[in-house]
Amino acid sequence: ETVQGAMVVMDYNGRVLGLVGGTGKKKVNLGLNRATMSKRQPGSTIKPLSVYGPALEKSLQDENTNIYWSTMIKDAPLKVVDGKPWPTNQGGGYSGSTVTLQYGLAQSKNTISARTLDMISDAGAVDYSLDFISNRFHISTLDSVKDCDYAPMATGGVTNGVTVLEMTAAYATFGNGGYYYEPYCYTKIEDVQGNVVLQKQPEKTKESALSENTAWVMNKLLQTVMTAGTGTSYKLSGIQCFGKTGTTTDDKDR
């Protein structure tokens, strides 16, 4: 079976610098572009967007929410679902010990993301999370009913999946002070006389998704993923990296 993949390279102002829609050479016109069209399960890559970023931001705005990089959280299931503890971590286990939020994110602990989400002060934590990722990070493929639950928001088991392009644009906010830019693939279009017919103005799509403080903390947390967490095998030598790993059922998506 052929393994497929997709990639988007984008600068911090939304300009798409490179895009790969699948492995191998292009064989057809208007074929499937997996980077922009395929909706795949995000797994744990959703956690910074649906849990950690929103939780840190909430702590700046709500005195009843106190969630920080150093917050101590128990590595244990949050609740019992159908007679079974939920969630468990990769491999089905949990330690029962107390760890920092930073460690839980770096090691991609499902228990920590679920408990962090539950710590958001008001009863509508899941609604807050879904609204944040949909309207601040512009992930457009989420189901407003089916994905408004702990499993989709805390562990990434969403209904329809997400695209690589939208995830790239969302993650860029952690590296540019919290600003979201709509991704674009052109700068301008001219007619045969050289008249500008269409010109992209990225600043018009600029929105504040996160405070500068939250973006800075998230950047540092995601650097830990690459230096001392699940992403150590993927870091680039000599380049400061931040990122997040994600794996779905039976390793179908990574």
Question: Where are the regions that the model predicts?
Answer:
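Active-site SXXK
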Residues: 14, 41-73, 104, 170-174, ...
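Glycine-rich, acidic and aromatic/proline-enriched surface loops and short helix-turn segments
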Residues: 9-25, 57-59, 78, 97, ...
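Mid-domain, small-residue-enriched loop/turn segments at the edges of structured enzyme/sensor domains
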Residues: 85-89, 121-168
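Thr-Gly-centered strand-to-loop micro-motif
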Residues: 74, 115, 157, 243-245
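Extracytoplasmic/secreted envelope proteins and their assembly/folding machinery
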Residues: 29, 33, 52, 70, ...
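Conserved catalytic neighborhood of penicillin-recognizing serine enzymes
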Residues: 60-127, 192-219, 223-224
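A penicillin-recognizing enzyme superfamily signal
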Residues: 1-9, 18-19, 25-38, 65-66, ...
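Secondary-structure capping and boundary motifs in well-ordered enzyme cores
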Residues: 6-13, 38-46, 93, 97, ...
